C-alpha cells in the first residue's frame, strides 16, 4: 500500500467576498500567463479529456457527478467537489461482448428521476445505423453502484414508436408542469443519416408514452448545416434543457461535430405545449461559437455552483483543426438573461487563469493516494489501491492522443519536504521520460500544461533531469547522465529545502539546483511519451 507522510502543508486562503460577487455576474477573466504559482482558488482550462460531457449536482451531498463514456464500451462516473475538476472515475456499467448495445456507447447522462439514479445513453451493435437509446436504473441509492438496463426506447415511427424503431442518440429528459418528457437526436427514416431533434412524452423514466414529434427543421439557417452552403445537409444533435425564471429552453449542437465549425443553437418554449412544434421558437443566430484558439465547441451542459450562486457552462472543444473527434472538456461561468435564457459569451482560451466556482471545497493537504486528478486521455490510465500507471496504450483506442499524461494529488505541500516513488517502465529504452511533479498548480491537458517543477528519468538518453513549466513552456534546469536499467524498478527521490532542490536515484545523490519560482503546490506523477507504473509513494 502507499504510505503518505506530511510534514508541512499549506493552508489555503479563503476566497474573498469581493471575488465571489465579481465572478458571479461577470464573464470576464484574466488571460495573462502570469509567472508563479496559482492561488488555491484558481484553475485553468481544459479541465479534462473527453467528449459529450455531462455533470450534475448530487442532491444528497455537496459534490458533482460526471457521467462519461469509457472507451465507447462502458460508462464511468467521476466524483468531484468542483465544476473546475472532473475527479476520480468509477466504471459503473460495461457493455456486453456482443449484441445490440455492445458497442459505440455514446453520450451518457446521469439524472435523478423519481427517486432513482438513471443513466440515459445510446449504443449499437458496432454499426452506427443501429444506434438506439437505452436507460440504466440504479439498483440501490448509490450512483456508483450497480445498474439494471432497460430499452431500447421506442424512438421510431408510428403510434408505437417501433414501426419501425429508428436511430436515436443524445437522449435527455426533463419535467415540465409535472409531466416528464424525453428529447433526442434522431433520423427521419431508416438509413437517412439526417439528424433532427425529437420529443416524446414519458409515462415512466424508462418508457415513452406517445409518438415522437419533430421539434423543428435541421436546416433553417446555413450555420446549422455541416458546411454553410445550401448543398450540405442540416444536422441537429445533443439537445440540453435549461430552466430558469419559469422559462424553458433547449440548446442544441449543430454543424459538423468533426469540424472546427461545430456550435450551439437554441430553441425557446414560447407556447404552452412542448409537444407542438409551433410552441418552439428557434434563435436566428448561434448562441455559442468557436474562436481562433478554442473551436469545435458543443455538446454542452449547465450546472450550478455548490452554493447555488453561479451557473456554469461545461462543453467540449476540438484538440486540433483536423477533421475528427479528439476533444477535451472546458468549464466556464455563464449568465442568465432577464428572461431566464442562457447567456454563454465566448469560449475561454486554454491556460486562461480563472476563479474556481463559488462554494468549491479548498483542499488544505494531500489526503490519500486515492484523492487525485488525472489529466490525459481516459484510456491511458490504470489505477489500483497500490499503483498508478500512466501512458497505457489501449487495445481498442478511441480518438486517443498523447498529452504528457499526469496525476496531481489534492492539496498543496509547502515548506521543506521530501518525496519518493518507485517507477517501472513498460516500453523499454524507447521511453522518453517519467517522473515526479512538485509544487504544481494549474494542471491541465497538455505536455507542459501546469505551473511547477518536474524531476524525471529519460531512458532513451540515460538522463536524470530537472525542469519547470509555466503553463505552456518547458525550461530545463539541470541534467546528469546516469545508468538506467529499464527492466528493473527504479526509485526516484526529490528533496526541497528552501530554494534548494535535490534529485536522487536508487538511494544515490544525483544533483542539487537552486530555483525559487514556485514556492507551494501539489505533488504528482507525469509521463512524456512513455508507459510507466508508479508505486510506493512517500512524502515526508
Name each model feature, range by range:
Residues 66-94:
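Beta-propeller domains
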Residues 201-207, 257-259, 268-271, 335, ...:
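Short edge-strand/loop segments of extracellular domains
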Residues 234-284:
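Loop/turn-rich, solvent-exposed surfaces of beta-rich toroidal or solenoidal domains
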Residues 263-336, 504-532:
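Aromatic sugar-binding interfaces of carbohydrate-active proteins
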Residues 80, 133-141, 196-204, 263-272, ...:
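Beta-propeller blade signature
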Residues 34-36, 342, 346-540:
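Extracellular glycan-recognition regions
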Residues 34-59, 84-111, 144-175, 203-240, ...:
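Surface loop/turn signatures of beta-propeller and other carbohydrate-active proteins
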Residues 51-71, 106-130, 136, 170-193, ...:
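Hydrophobic core segments of beta-strands in well-ordered, beta-rich domains
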Amino acid at each position: 500500500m502507499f504510505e503518505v507522510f506530511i510534514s508541512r502543508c499549506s493552508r489555503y486562503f479563503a476566497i474573498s467576498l469581493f471575488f465571489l460577487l465579481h465572478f458571479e455576474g461577470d464573464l470576464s477573466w484574466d488571460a495573462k500567463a502570469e509567472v508563479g504559482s496559482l492561488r488555491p482558488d484558481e484553475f485553468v482550462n481544459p479541465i479534462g479529456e473527453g467528449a459529450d460531457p455531462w455533470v450534475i449536482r448530487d442532491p444528497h451531498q455537496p459534490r458533482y457527478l460526471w457521467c462519461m463514456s469509457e472507451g465507447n464500451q462502458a460508462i464511468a462516473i467521476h466524483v468531484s467537489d468542483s465544476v473546475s475538476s472532473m475527479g476520480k472515475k468509477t466504471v459503473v456499467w460495461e457493455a456486453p461482448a456482443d449484441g445490440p448495445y455492445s458497442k459505440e456507447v455514446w453520450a451518457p447522462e446521469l439524472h435523478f428521476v423519481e427517486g432513482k439514479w438513471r443513466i440515459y445513453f445510446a449504443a449499437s451493435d458496432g454499426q452506427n445505423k443501429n444506434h438506439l437509446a437505452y436507460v440504466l436504473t440504479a439498483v440501490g441509492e448509490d450512483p456508483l453502484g450497480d445498474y439494471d438496463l432497460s430499452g431500447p426506447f421506442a424512438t421510431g415511427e408510428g403510434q408505437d414508436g417501433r414501426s419501425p424503431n429508428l436511430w436515436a442518440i443524445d437522449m435527455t429528459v426533463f419535467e415540465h408542469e409535472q409531466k416528464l418528457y424525453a428529447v433526442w437526436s434522431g433520423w427521419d427514416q431508416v438509413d437517412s443519416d439526417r439528424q433532427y431533434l425529437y420529443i416524446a412524452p414519458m409515462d415512466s423514466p424508462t418508457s415513452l408514452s406517445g409518438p415522437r414529434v419533430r421539434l423543428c427543421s435541421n436546416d433553417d439557417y446555413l450555420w446549422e448545416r455541416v458546411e454553410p452552403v445550401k448543398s450540405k445537409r442540416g444536422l441537429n444533435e445533443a439537445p440540453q434543457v435549461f430552466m430558469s425564471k419559469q422559462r424553458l429552453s433547449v440548446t442544441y449542437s449543430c454543424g459538423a461535430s468533426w469540424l472546427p465549425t461545430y456550435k450551439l443553437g437554441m430553441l425557446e418554449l414560447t407556447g404552452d405545449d412542448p409537444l407542438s412544434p409551433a410552441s418552439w421558437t428557434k434563435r436566428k443566430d448561434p448562441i455559442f461559437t468557436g474562436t481562433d484558439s478554442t473551436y469545435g465547441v458543443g455538446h454542452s451542459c449547465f450546472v450550478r455552483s455548490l452554493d447555488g450562486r453561479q451557473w456554469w457552462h461545461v462543453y467540449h472543444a476540438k484538440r486540433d483543426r483536423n477533421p475528427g473527434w479528439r476533444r477535451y472538456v472546458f468549464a466556464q461561468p455563464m449568465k442568465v438573461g432577464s428572461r431566464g435564457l442562457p447567456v454563454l459569451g465566448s469560449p475561454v482560451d486554454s491556460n486562461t487563469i480563472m476563479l474556481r466556482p463559488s462554494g468549491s471545497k479548498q483542499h488544505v493537504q494531500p489526503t490519500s493516494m486515492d484523492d487525485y486528478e488525472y489529466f490525459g486521455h481516459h484510456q491511458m490510465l490504470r489505477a489500483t489501491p497500490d499503483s498508478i500507471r500512466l501512458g497505457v496504450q489501449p487495445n481498442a483506442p478511441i480518438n486517443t492522443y498523447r498529452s504528457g499524461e499526469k496525476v496531481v494529488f489534492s492539496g498543496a505541500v509547502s515548506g521543506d519536504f521530501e518525496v519518493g516513488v518507485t517507477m517501472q517502465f513498460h516500453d523499454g529504452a524507447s521511453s522518453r521520460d517519467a517522473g515526479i511533479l512538485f509544487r504544481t498548480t494549474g494542471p491541465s491537458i497538455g505536455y507542459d500544461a501546469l505551473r511547477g517543477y518536474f524531476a524525471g528519468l529519460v531512458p532513451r538518453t540515460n538522463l536524470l533531469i530537472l525542469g519547470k513549466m509555466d503553463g505552456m513552456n518547458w525550461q530545463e534546469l539541470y541534467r546528469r547522465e546516469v545508468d538506467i536499467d529499464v527492466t528493473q524498478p527504479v526509485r526516484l527521490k526529490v528533496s526541497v529545502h528552501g530554494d534548494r532542490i535535490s534529485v536522487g536515484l536508487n538511494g544515490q545523490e544525483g544533483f542539487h539546483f537552486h530555483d525559487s519560482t514556485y514556492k507551494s503546490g501539489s505533488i504528482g506523477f507525469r509521463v512524456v511519451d512513455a508507459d510507466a507504473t508508479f508505486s510506493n509513494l512517500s512524502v515526508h
